[in-house]
Amino acid sequence: MRDKLKSFFTEHWKYMAVSTACKLNIFDHLKEAKTAKHLADELSLNEDKLLLLLNALSNAEILDKTSNYFKRNSLSELLTENNPESLKYACLNWNDEHLTAWQNLDYSITTGKSSFEDIYGQPFFDFLNDNPEKLQAYHKAMYQYAKDDYKTLPDLIDFSKHKSVMDIGGGYGAVLENIKAKYPSIDCILFDLPKVIEKVTIPSIKKLGGSFFEKIPNQSEAIVLSRVLHDWNDEKASLILKNSFEALPQNGTLYVIENCSDK
């Protein structure tokens, strides 16, 4: 029991090792086996410290090690930039500001206020909108998560009864991409902020820019809200729902997809 408890104390070490390797593009450069010296020279890193990191990743079975050579395996292959199934940005998403906010959790529990806002002086999504690189990285992460998490959604919901489906706050379009793959005849419409929409490169879906706190265009007989409402307080979540209902035709359908707790 004590050992199980003690293991909790250092769980973040593994994540920090993996996310640091992602941040430094280490996995991208280990398609072929290399020594720590070779990789350090290639990426302008400190050889001694890099060797410690590579050994840690090998012990965690994230890298394969043969003699003094390290090479990525099937796990770390998923943390490379150009892999179609990549989780690199999903991994990086929980670093930096997220970690800092978690370290301030006691403030939130004590005051009932946002630990993120206490540190950064603004709500999380305002912070993203003021930092374009962070915004792009965030939506890349959400896209990578959604490609996995919503892979079976078109099997669970019969979208064939709709001529059109609009994803509200759909980021880079992963949900619609999954729907379109199974129901190619459906008109798929992505609605998100203009600065998000301009980065979307899926040719098979229509893209509309705007805010779900304002008017949502009446262009679809079905609307999907996937993991949107939990990001907002009750007042703003109610406004999103109100605007979504107003955007639907009389017999339209609203699909709300959320992770639900017991209460």
Model-found features: residue ranges?
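Alpha-helical subdomain
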Residues: 1-59, 64-65, 75, 159, ...
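Conserved Class I S-adenosyl-L-methionine-dependent methyltransferase catalytic core
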Residues: 2-29, 41-42, 48-163
